[in-house]
Every structure is written in structure tokens, then in C-alpha cells.
Amino acid sequence: MASNKILGIDLGTTNSAFAVMEGDDPEIIVNAEGDRTTPSVVAMTDDEERLVGKPAKNQVIQNPDQTIRSIKRHMGEEDYTVELGGEDYTPEQVSAMILQKIKRDAEEYLGDEIEKAVITVPAYFNDRQRQATKDAGEIAGFEVDRIVNEPTAASMAYGLDDESNQTILVYDLGGGTFDVSVLDLGGGVYEVVATNGDNDLGGDDWDDAVIDWLAGEFEDNHGIDLRDDRQALQRLKDAAEEAKIELSSRKETTINLPFITATDSGPVHLEETLSRAKFESLTEDLIERTVGPTEQALEDAGYDDSDIDEVILVGGSTRMPQVREKVEDLLGTEPKKNVNPDEAVALGAAIQGGVLAGDVDDIVLLDVTPLSLGIEVKGGLFERLIDKNTTIPTEESKVFTTAAANQTSVNVRVFQGEREIAEENELLGEFQLAGIPPAPAGTPQIEVTFNIDENGIVNVEAEDQGSGNAESITIEGGAGLSDEEIEQMQEEAEAHAEEDERRRERIEARNSAESAVQRAETLLEENEEDIDDDLKESIEDEVESVEAVLEDEDATKEEIEDVTESLSSELQEIGKQMYDAQQAAAGAGAGAAGAGAGAGPGGMGDMGDMGDMGGAAGSGDADNEYVDADFEDVDDDTKDE
């Protein structure tokens, strides 16, 4: 039965988290591995088993070529694919694999089907990236009710129980992206005033700095560049990440990687000591990259640092002391420490899910578009229709005209960004409006309307006001996914889910078969004298049949279950035979010794042993249970003519 709960998902670069409203409070959901966060990692093993999350991360050193990490950094990129198991996948598809696991684990935890989700994205994600994220959710089987900016979600988690009016700044440094947002909170209204960020800055870059340092030191000492060896590079990656984490609480750490490579003289080991001071000097340029967006967000909001009442840190990378110190130096405010940086975004997404589901009252979220939107006009200029930091949803229109005489069509090219030259911004899409009656240049009036919905997704329409002809476009994700393509990917994802389920059932069948063989061998060995020769031979034949099927890698679940059931029947026969023998022995003993007081307990003890054996022989089922068209802008006087 489907639940009416809406799952809040923080789909992160390195780790993801998910939560749901339980009563009046959001609650993080523990995944199948018992963890509160799930690594955003996907892998394919040699036997074509797909791994997602912690199992995928755990095997990355042995299988670096078939392990995908930080796919979020490529969301919305056209023509970008990764190869897994001989097949190419888009970032949307890989992200959907992660979301599938999240969906499955949440349903297992809650005991209900989950159909709807709120998924968060970096505030500085453009339209392509937002649409790509929504597509990923739909591929995974979710109805994506809302796309929410990560800093906004975090502010909701922070301010849920706070009725005071205040201005907060959310500094969100995750694994692959950086965002900063300024919000006004009060009376249950969360209003984003300004946002800024860098989609190419995150904890991965701190790791890369340590990797480069380690590889450089090793090359200086041994003349070998470990970055040319995929497996060694992956070991460096894991060691760098671990060192970064350790240096958040320690002054120095030792990085020890034995047998990192080999030469003609034998194996070579890596051992380096990294101090926090050295680490911070290696990454000083990275932390400085967060200063510009932070100052710009304050400027766009019209605030000074003294206007900020609270600073919230979001994202695991904000645990680094240099980050906390930089934020405090920059804003003059000590960041709050009562918000879990790994969980705040998911909790806020769950709160927004509760609002949409009608479970949470008196909360209004007023988010903004992070970048300006407009079209290319004559001379390649970028003409803005919607400025950055405009509250969404919103709609704006502007009238343009043709730049050439007798122009019967115009090409509308939609861009997003802050550069004055259109081509230097992000091209979101383009479409053609035809059927414009021939007329002198500057005569036709073409109204262009931009609409941004609550998810930050853009629809653009152009209408020739003379003829009434109109065309429109909804900006698609990075792969330009149509409904049909999304449906196809959903089917592929579901097919993989069924395949995974079949694999699980087959493994469980094999486990039951192996257990039955082990029980049979134990029974034959321990009760050889109590089993007649015919039954013993029959059981040995059944064991051989089971072992033969287990040796066949192509054996189906049904074939395995058939031979296991046959063996289990024979084992039950053993139980019956031995029970009868025990009964007879008990009766004879009673006849010889009379109704002695010790006979009853002796018989009961034997019956207890038989009961255990009978249970073991029939426990196969129990195991399973556990188991161009240039444009000219028309000025206001022209519009009125």
C-alpha cells in the first residue's frame, strides 16, 4: 500500500541522506546498511552485479574502472556518459540508481511504498541541472513534487521551532558544490533574499590537493608517478579523504600505504606525515574561492555582515577547522553548531514534503532563481527578462521586434547567466517562431514570456501579436530527455530492479541448498548406525544431485529449489526413522526396568535430541525466511503604438 508520506532526499555528490516527517518532526531514515548517510557511489562487478552505496564504495580500490563517484558534478552535461558493464549511462541514469536504493531502503524502513519525493539541489544549479535531477527522480520511480535548494532546505531544518524574526546565512560546502544563501526568517516564512555559489568547488577538491601532494612527494623520492596507475590513484584518493577527516580533529596524521607499487627491486611503500598546517596551506586557494560568492550574496541581499543574526554550516566539508575559522573571520559571527551538516538538508526536504502533503502548517517557502534568464538579441547581446534572485514562481514578459525587413521567422535562444554576451552564458535551449507576416524591420511585435515554476524549471513562449502564432519550450535536462526517454529509462531501471531481485532469490536458494547438504553430511556422519543402508544411499544420491546443480553456474533458482526440496524430504525421512527407533528403544527400556522413575526423563532427553534433528532436517524454508532572427527590444513608447 502506498504511503501519503513524501520523502525528503539530499542527493549529494559524495553522500546522500533521506528523511520523512514522523509526527511533528523530520526523521532521518537509516539505510539497509544501518547508516544515516549513503555513499553516492555506483559500481558494476565482474559478474555484472550492480552495487550502490556502501558496498560500491568498499570495493572501489579493487574495481576503480567500474566504479562511479561524484556523478552529481556532471548533472545536466550534454553528451556526457559513463561506462558500466559495457553500457553507457547518463548522469541522470546513474543518479537514478542511487535514488532507487534510497527508495527501496525507505520503503523497507517505513513498511510502505513511497511514491513522492522532494529532492534538493545546489542553489546555484542552473535549469538544465535542475531538470536533470528531476528526470533522475522520475527514472527511479518517484513523482518529484518539488526541487528545493539545499541551503533553503537546511534553513527550514534550523528554523522549524524558532518563531523569531532573523536573518541567516547558510554556507553550504559539500563534496562537489558550494552555495551560500541569505534568508529572512519569521512567522513561518522562509524568504531567500539572495544566493550565490560555485558548482565546481567542494570537498573533492580538498582531496585532490592532498592527492597531488602525495603523488608529488612519492615521485620526488622514487621517480614514479602514481597518478598513472588507476588502482594506486584510488588508494591515494581514499587515503586523502581519510586524512582530511582526521585533520578536522587532530593536528597531524600519518598516511601509510604499503605496496603502493613495485619496481624491479621489489615492492615500494608510501608513508607521509601530513600536518593540519600543511593541509591548510595546500588548500588555502580553495577556501579563498568561497569568499567571493559569500560577499556577493551579501551585496545582492543589500546586507552587511553585521545584519546576519546566525550562520549555518551545511555539508560535511564544513567540519574542517579552516572553513569554520574563515566563515567566522568573514562574517564576524560564530557558526551554529547545533545543526548536523550531513543531515540538515535532508531534514529540511522532509519538512517541505510535509508542507506539500498537508502535514506541516504555517510554513511558507519563498525561494529564488540563482541566475538571470533571458534571450539573445541583435549583436549577440544577452537581454534579461528575469533577474537573478527573483522570488519564484514568477513570470515576466517583454516585447521584441525584428531587425531585418520581411523577416518571417525568428530564432529564440534562451540563456541563463550573468554575462552581457549571450554566448558566454549557459545556452538552455532554442526554438523557432515562424509564420510572421512580412513587414518592414521593427514593425512586428513579438512577446516573449518566461515562466519559472516552484521547482525553478523554465518555460519560454514567443507569440507574434499580429498573427497570433506562438511557440514555446520547456527547458529539458542535460540529455534533453523527452517523456518517452524518461519512460524508457524507468523501464530499464525497473528491469534492473527485477534482475537484482532474481539474483537475490537465486543466492538465497543456493544458500539453502548448501545448508541442506551440510545438514545431511552431519546427520550421516553422526548417526551412521541408526540409518538403514537404503536410506543412506538415497540421501547420498540426493546430496550428489544438489552438489551437481550448485556447480552449474547457469542453474536457475527453480532447479536449485527442486533438488533442495528432494534432499529435505529425505532428511525428514531420517528424522522419522530415528524417531521410531528412539520410541522403540524407550519402550523396550520401560519393559525391562518396569515403570522406573528414571525412564521418563531419559526418554524425554532423547526425544529432545530428536526434535532438534527433525527441526534441522526441515529448516530449508526457515532459512529462506531469514534469509537569428536577430531581435530588437521594443521600447515602451513603441509598445503602446
UniProtKB/Swiss-Prot annotation:
* Origin superkingdom: Archaea
Which CDD domains does the record associate with it? ASKHA_NBD_HSP70_DnaK-like
Cite the record's Acidic residues compositional bias ranges: 622-641
Kindly state which keywords UniProt assigns to this record, in alphabetical order.
ATP-binding, Chaperone, Nucleotide-binding
Keyword check for Nucleotidyltransferase: no
Tell me which Pfam families the record gives: HSP70
Does Isomerase show up as a keyword for this record?
no
Q: Which InterPro entries does the entry mention?
A: ATPase_NBD, Chaperone_DnaK, Heat_shock_70_CS, HSP70_C_sf, HSP70_peptide-bd_sf, Hsp_70_fam
What are the disulphide bonds in this sequence?
Answer: none
Biased amino acid composition, Basic and acidic residues: 493-511
Q: Where is this region: Disordered?
A: 488-527, 585-641
Gene3D superfamilies, per database record: 1.20.1270.10, 3.30.420.40, Actin, Chain A, domain 4 (3.90.640.10), Substrate Binding Domain Of DNAk, Chain A, domain 1 (2.60.34.10)
Q: Which molecular function term from Gene Ontology is one that the record holds?
A: ATP-dependent protein folding chaperone
Q: Biased composition, Gly residues: where in the chain?
A: 588-618
NCBIfam families of this UniProt entry?
Answer: PRK00290.1 (NF001413), prok_dnaK (TIGR02350)
Q: HAMAP family, per this entry?
A: DnaK
Role this protein plays: Acts as a chaperone.
Q: Give the family from UniProt.
A: Belongs to the heat shock protein 70 family.
Q: Can you say what this protein is called?
A: Chaperone protein DnaK
Which organism does this sequence originate in?
Haloquadratum walsbyi (strain DSM 16790 / HBSQ001)
